[in-house]
Design a protein with these regions (language model features):
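N-terminal leader/targeting and pre-domain segments
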Residues: 1-21, 96-111
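Hydrophobic beta-strand anchors of alpha/beta hydrolase catalytic cores
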Residues: 22-23, 50, 73
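Local sequence-structure signature of Cys/Sec-based thiol-disulfide redox active-site neighborhoods
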Residues: 6-43
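Structural micro-motif
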Residues: 65-76
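Structural microenvironment flanking redox-active thiols in thiol-disulfide oxidoreductases
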Residues: 56-63, 99
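Short amphipathic alpha-helix with an adjacent loop that forms part of the alpha/beta core around
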Residues: 12-14, 61-65
Length: 111
């Protein structure tokens, strides 16, 4: 029998990165999830994080983190610093990601 591993030991969380991992929990039937996706996409253009999408119905991670109210996101900086946000409404997703993720430095024509 294989030894069980903790969810934070998966490759998604152990791969070297500069920003946090943001896991979006969604389902095909979630009416509010498309708006959350658009908010995450908008913040991804200006802030540093790795974005992963999990189906809340089939995700063992969602089960382990007791995700019950969608839209939901996990913001994972480290084993000691992570937070699951659930039942997000309005601009909650944008507000959370702007607070949790650092701005990406972009060299453009205005630089």
């Amino acid at each position: 029998m294989a030894a069980a591993t903790d969810w934070w030991e998966s490759e998604l969380f152990t791969t070297p990165r500069t920003g946090p991992v943001v896991v979006q929990f969604t389902t095909e039937v979630c009416a509010l999830c498309p708006a959350a996706t658009l908010q995450i996409d908008a913040v991804a253009k200006t802030h540093d994080f790795v974005w992963h999408i999990d189906n809340a119905f089939t995700s063992t991670l969602a089960d382990e983190l007791e995700v019950h109210a969608l839209p939901a996101v996990l913001v994972f900086h480290s084993v000691d610093k992570h937070q699951v946000y659930q039942k997000l409404r309005g601009d909650d997703v944008t507000r959370i990601l702007l607070a949790e993720c650092t701005p990406r430095l972009v060299l453009d024509e205005d630089f």
